[in-house]
């Protein structure tokens, strides 16, 4: 296989994705250059040393990427695949590179032009899977603990072929969780919070961290897209907004509506677990607000959105996360902070913060 990695991203955010992989690679003393084509929905990063591409996808924790939806090692671009046999050249690229991979994904970038190739990708998957199994490149059954084979079509008859590691990649096809919009939700923004739960919270921890009966606050709540997700998980919610909340949410008896400015509201309860916030405001102002809640011990976990400026978007996010981390540490607070541009996000990123309490002698564990 070659010295390149491919990263999927949102169309229009290729430069941010390129800046991110270049910076993270340099931190590992791996050097190369990014190839960027605007609005293509992907970035290629070419390493100067042959073995470095595999090192990158092993050693950079995937969850630390903000703008990348998927990462994989790829070979040279396969061009002009013969219509009578597209399978053999793809198989040839993988012979001796990978054995007994657990899954095959034939994918495209998330752009309108590329989506026209999806039907073809589905048709190719069956014969290709069969041929890869015959060559022992793919295991006889799907295995979530083995590497994933990616065939990434960028145009008809043109694809990159490569692999990712299942313990350090996105588990989703094309890096996109498939979520269905609930017809009774007050707004489409509800999908942002649902996706955030899938991305930031391991499935085996949902029962503990998204538990029935928890208390939550939604700042800038109306009409209730994010509150809806909390209601669905049987939480009790303080919804803060000067606007109107959807009557369907108020009728559940789980929502208390406070007509107030989300930036000025202060909670009266001491047992709030979740804080969520999707307000249209400058990123710095929102970051400072959430930091204040965490410093004051008003919540345990928070999910919030940062609306991005037109320029220097990557720098803006990094600066805000660093500012939050610094202020929390100054106040003696340990926290896990991760950000992701979700599929359902637009010119924004979603941030998740979780306070971590270290067990001190004689001190009650505040997590429970």
UniProtKB/Swiss-Prot annotation:
GO terms for biological process: methylation; rRNA processing. Keywords: Cytoplasm, Methyltransferase, rRNA processing, S-adenosyl-L-methionine, Transferase. The keyword Cell inner membrane does not apply. S-adenosyl-L-methionine binds at residues 189, 222-225, 241, 261, 278. It holds the Pfam family RLMM_N. Its EC number is 2.1.1.186. One of its GO terms (cellular component) is cytoplasm. InterPro entries: RlmM_FDX, RlmM_THUMP-like, RNA_MeTrfase_FtsJ_dom, rRNA_MeTrfase_M, SAM-dependent_MTases_sf. The keyword Cytoplasm applies. It catalyses: cytidine(2498) in 23S rRNA + S-adenosyl-L-methionine = 2'-O-methylcytidine(2498) in 23S rRNA + S-adenosyl-L-homocysteine + H(+). Its main location: cytoplasm. GO terms for molecular function: S-adenosylmethionine-dependent methyltransferase activity. Catalyzes the 2'-O-methylation at nucleotide C2498 in 23S rRNA. Belongs to the class I-like SAM-binding methyltransferase superfamily. RNA methyltransferase RlmE family. RlmM subfamily. NCBIfam families: PRK11760.1. This is Ribosomal RNA large subunit methyltransferase M. It comes from Yersinia pestis (strain Pestoides F). The gene is rlmM.
């Amino acid at each position: 296989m070659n010295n390149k990695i491919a990263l999927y991203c949102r169309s229009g955010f290729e430069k941010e994705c390129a800046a991110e992989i270049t910076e993270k690679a340099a931190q590992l003393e791996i050097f190369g250059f990014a190839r960027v084509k605007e609005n293509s929905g992907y970035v290629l990063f070419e390493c100067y040393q042959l073995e470095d591409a595999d090192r990158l996808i092993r050693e950079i924790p995937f969850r630390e990427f903000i703008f990348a939806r998927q990462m994989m090692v790829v070979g040279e671009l396969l061009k002009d695949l013969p219509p009578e046999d597209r399978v053999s050249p793809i198989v040839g690229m993988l012979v001796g590179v990978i054995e007994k991979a657990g899954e095959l994904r034939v994918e495209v970038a998330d752009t309108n032009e590329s989506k026209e190739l999806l039907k073809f990708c589905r048709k190719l998957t069956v014969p290709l899977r069969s041929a890869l199994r015959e060559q022992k490149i793919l295991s006889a059954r799907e295995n979530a603990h083995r590497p994933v084979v990616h065939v990434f079509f960028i145009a008809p008859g043109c694809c990159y072929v490569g692999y990712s590691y299942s313990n350090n990649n996105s588990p989703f096809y094309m890096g996109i969780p498939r979520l269905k919009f609930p017809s009774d939700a007050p707004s489409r923004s509800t999908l942002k919070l649902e996706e955030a739960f899938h991305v930031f919270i391991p499935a085996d921890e949902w029962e503990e961290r998204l538990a029935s009966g928890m208390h939550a606050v939604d700042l800038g709540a109306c009409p209730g897209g994010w509150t809806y997700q909390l209601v669905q998980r049987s939480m009790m919610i303080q919804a803060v907004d000067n606007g109107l909340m959807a009557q369907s949410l108020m009728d559940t008896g789980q929502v208390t509506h406070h007509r107030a400015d989300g930036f000025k509201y202060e909670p009266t309860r001491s047992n709030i677990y979740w804080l969520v916030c999707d307000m249209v405001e400058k990123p710095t102002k929102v970051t400072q607000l959430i930091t204040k809640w965490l410093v004051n011990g008003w919540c345990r976990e928070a999910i919030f959105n940062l609306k991005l400026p037109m320029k220097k978007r990557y720098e803006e996010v990094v600066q805000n996360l660093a500012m939050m981390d610094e202020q929390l540490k100054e106040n003696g607070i340990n926290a896990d902070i991760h950000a992701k541009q979700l599929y359902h996000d637009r010119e924004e990123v979603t941030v998740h913060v979780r306070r971590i309490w270290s067990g001190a002698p004689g001190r009650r564990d505040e997590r429970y």
